[in-house]
Amino acid sequence: MRLWFCLSLFIVLCLEHFPGTLADERNVPESEEKTEQFLRDLPKINRKGPRPPGFSPFRGKFHSQTLRDLPKINRKGPRPPGFSPFRGKFHSQTLRDLPKINRKGPRPPGFSPFRGKFHSQSLRDLPKINRKGPRPPGFSPFRGKFHSQSHV
């Protein structure tokens, strides 16, 4: 890392001492004149010719059409049932159907939307789990170097 830093610093210092490089361009008003000329020419550059239909500087699914055509794209037809712009477990159904999904039926015992060691049982069953029986000696719910022994 230090080698790259020293090398890049050395190159910059060398470039500043040669004529016609960074040191000269920094203080020369010609570069400002070029910038002003470029800004004056920008409207001409933009008006060179009309863009072809369907052209967009953006790339993507909805950018092959111009921005004016976006409302037409949205109104092309009704979306199929179950369509959602989001992808995921709960987005295969529309947002209106989410309450129906939740009310479909009772969840199976042990089901939980969370995954993990303590989530295989539902939250209602946690007190029962804790009261099932005495913990074996040396048991700790924590895992680690100092948790293999029980605290007395």
Swiss-Prot record:
Family label: Belongs to the bradykinin-related peptide family.
Hydrolase keyword on record: no
Taxonomic source organism: Bombina maxima
Protein localization: Secreted
MF term (GO), any: toxin activity
InterPro entries named among the record's database cross-references: Bradykinin
Keywords carried by this UniProt record: Amphibian defense peptide, Bradykinin receptor impairing toxin, G-protein coupled receptor impairing toxin, Repeat, Secreted, Signal, Toxin, Vasoactive, Vasodilator
Protein name: Kininogen-1c
GO cellular component, one term: extracellular region
Biased composition (Basic and acidic residues): 28-44
Disordered as annotated region, ranges: 28-152
Signal sequence annotation: 1-23
GO biological process: defense response; vasodilation
